[in-house]
């Protein structure tokens, strides 16, 4: 039986136990996999040298389940701090008879509680959303510890996007400002996430070698596949973080309502 860590207060800016957040993450996982061109576009989906894989911050497990289904010979483990999301992921693994998909409740910012050399590939998406900037060195060293010699850590991060809508641009500016004030980004002014700018240095200092970077641009526009998913993701994200934005003094309830409603009109 998998051993779960007890839940403690975490740094995630969203409500990790929220059903709304669970639905948003499932939607976001589909959007990202589709927009990036598949589960492993950088490898042309060739995982012949991968036997054991870990997904850090797996949420409700959508990516893990997709990988486990596509690659039945690979053992895929997902960890997340949310007990509710892990229970959801386990239930779906059972329903889909995915015996190679495993899930555990764990805080990725603490010891990962796996033996050294456990995995061939460690995957993590949007780590900036739950990792204070001071925690990156220890987080990456822990990833290196559990990787086998020649193993891969695969990180996916995003930076701020631009839009033809001033209201959408304003919304997009608020998120890095929120993370900056929460101590999560490396930006000096909170105008962007910046994490990709410092990633190579962080990886090198943690002991990683053969560092490679693959830049991708995901088009989000009317008529483009995935547009409605992206709009829904934006809606739910900002509905959820609005109280925090106001509490931190980034905006006011009145300004938020005006900008948010204008953005909805602009993206219809």
What are these regions (language model features)?
Residues 1-31:
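N-terminal, positively charged/glycine-rich alpha-helical extensions of SAM-dependent methyltransferases
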Residues 120-135:
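A short SAM/SAH-binding and catalytic strip from SAM-dependent methyltransferases
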């Amino acid at each position: 039986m998998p051993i779960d860590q007890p839940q403690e207060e975490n740094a995630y800016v969203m409500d990790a136990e929220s059903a709304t957040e669970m639905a948003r993450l499932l939607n976001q996982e589909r959007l990202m996999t589709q927009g990036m061109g598949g589960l492993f576009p950088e490898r042309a989906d060739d995982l012949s040298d991968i036997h054991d894989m870990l997904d850090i911050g797996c949420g409700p497990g959508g990516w893990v389940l997709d990988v486990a289904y596509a690659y039945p010979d690979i053992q895929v483990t997902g960890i997340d701090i949310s007990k509710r999301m892990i229970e959801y992921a386990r239930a779906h693994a059972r329903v889909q008879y995915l015996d190679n998909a495993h899930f555990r409740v764990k805080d990725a910012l603490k010891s990962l509680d796996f033996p050294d050399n456990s995995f061939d590939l460690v995957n993590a998406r949007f780590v900036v959303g739950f990792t204070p900037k001071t925690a990156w060195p220890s987080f990456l060293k822990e990833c290196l510890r559990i990787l086998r010699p020649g193993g891969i850590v695969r990180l996916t991060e995003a930076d701020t996007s631009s839009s033809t809508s001033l209201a959408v641009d304003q919304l997009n500016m608020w998120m890095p400002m929120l993370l900056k004030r929460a101590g999560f980004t490396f930006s000096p002014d909170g105008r962007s996430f910046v994490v990709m700018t410092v990633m190579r240095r962080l990886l090198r200092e943690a002991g990683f070698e053969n560092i490679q970077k693959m830049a991708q641009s995901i088009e989000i526009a009317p008529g483009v596949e995935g547009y409605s998913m992206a709009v829904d993701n934006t809606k739910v994200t900002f509905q959820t973080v609005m109280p925090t934005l106001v509490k931190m003094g980034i905006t006011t309830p009145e300004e938020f309502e005006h900008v948010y409603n204008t953005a909805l009109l602009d993206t219809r």
